[in-house]
């Protein structure tokens, strides 16, 4: 047994990873509230308000609307001791910012690689001196930017930042009264293109099939009009435009890899297996050229980049019989859904997932921690103030800390509602880099 003990000790010393160790990150960050409010004057709803966040030990934080390294006049400055929860919500709205660096959907190009700050910064003060600065940013090319660090990680070792029901977002650039009525339908406030630009790499879709009401001679049009993105039994938006956003992103962000999970088919597919053929035909037309071939196993990112240079999207499909027929479809992601109505219940459920070594066995494939609450019957029927927005607000304020301090070494895919309300994208990237660098240190032994 002594040689085995020596190897384990050497592995810990060489990688520097210690189980249960908190991930080292900047102690301040910005998030965007999932809530909205009605102004005292005017009819337009106010949403996407900026939140300042910090960890213990930070004395003062401030919000800036321009880079404080050039302009040190904050619009908000507070003492953290007055806000023991570690978060302060401002009245400044992100609104619909320009995705700088050429990352607007309709921008002809070229696009600039790297991270890009939007129009809000947070700074921390100690003894009246500005110590640290962070911005709210987009991270459209984070995988290729950090290729040397993360390339050795397998798909099951990388930490993938994701969204839940990714296609269920609001209909316009501004929040409408109609959107607010969909209290338990809309789960995001960014379209799929923007989710990818911010750094999300796992897109979760549920597809419904609705036979066309009127006959059309074009079979292509009939297929397109029949396939919708659903939230359970409710259809939200057509599928094709979302697939094209994924394709456009992959064409502009070379080197990025996206997990596209067609996870469930809640309407129109049960007992009608030929309809899967229509969906697969559509996927083949829209994404086959950039789809990664499934060759068994869960390879490293470097292997994908080297062996499948055109492949940029891993399409996982929630029907194993369909997967067996197509070399470019991957087995389903194992979503871990707690069906919890309280933050404590969700935390305990996810803690069990993170400690489940059988679940996390890399040979079993990709798995996702679904970090969102489920509304109960009482909420649906008798609580007019309850919504997915309010539930996301209670979870998102905790989720960043859970992942950063306890789960970053165990997690594979982490999804959330209204993802800008947490810092999961940044934590997932930092965790992947730390794990990748540790793997490289071990290889160099």
Per-region residue spans from a language model:
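Conserved, mostly hydrophobic/aromatic
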Residues: 206, 260, 315, 414
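Surface-exposed substrate-engagement region within the catalytic domains
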Residues: 293-406
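Catalytic cores of phosphodiester-bond-cleaving enzymes
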Residues: 230-290
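Active-site beta-strand/loop microenvironment that shapes enzyme catalytic pockets
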Residues: 199-209
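Short, aromatic/basic amphipathic alpha-helical patches
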Residues: 274-286, 326-332, 426-433
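Loop/turn elements at helix/coil->beta-strand transitions in domains of secreted/extracellular proteins
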Residues: 198-201, 253-259, 289, 309-312, ...
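Long, acidic (Asp/Glu-rich), low-complexity accessory segments flanking structured domains
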Residues: 19-198, 211-252, 257, 321-325, ...
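Cleavable N-terminal signal peptides of Sec/SRP-targeted secreted and luminal proteins
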Residues: 3-20
